[in-house]
Design a protein with these regions (language model features):
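Phosphopantetheine-dependent thiolation modules in NRPS/PKS and related acyl-activating systems
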Residues: 1-34, 38-43, 48-76
Length: 76
């Protein structure tokens, strides 16, 4: 599991964001497109792509994309 791959898959969940705009230190909850529905989309993507079940708590406790990546990696 690689961080850059996770960032690309994370970015693909957004309609208006380009993967090149996303970096590991992006505070994703501050993005204009972020919503509770986006959180559900990320939870589903992580389950489908990585076979890991994350919870809303994991997203709430993560500030950056890399923080969330580290949570997913620790559960894998």
């Amino acid at each position: 599991m690689e961080l850059q791959d996770f960032i690309k898959k994370f970015a693909s969940q957004f309609d208006t964001m380009d993967a090149s705009e996303m970096t590991a230190d992006v505070e994703f909850k501050a993005l204009d497109e972020w919503s509770s529905l986006m959180a559900l989309s990320i939870i589903a993507m992580v389950d489908e792509e990585y076979g890991v079940a994350i919870k809303g708590k994991d997203i709430r406790e993560s500030e950056t994309i890399e923080d969330l990546f580290n949570v997913v990696k620790s559960l894998k």
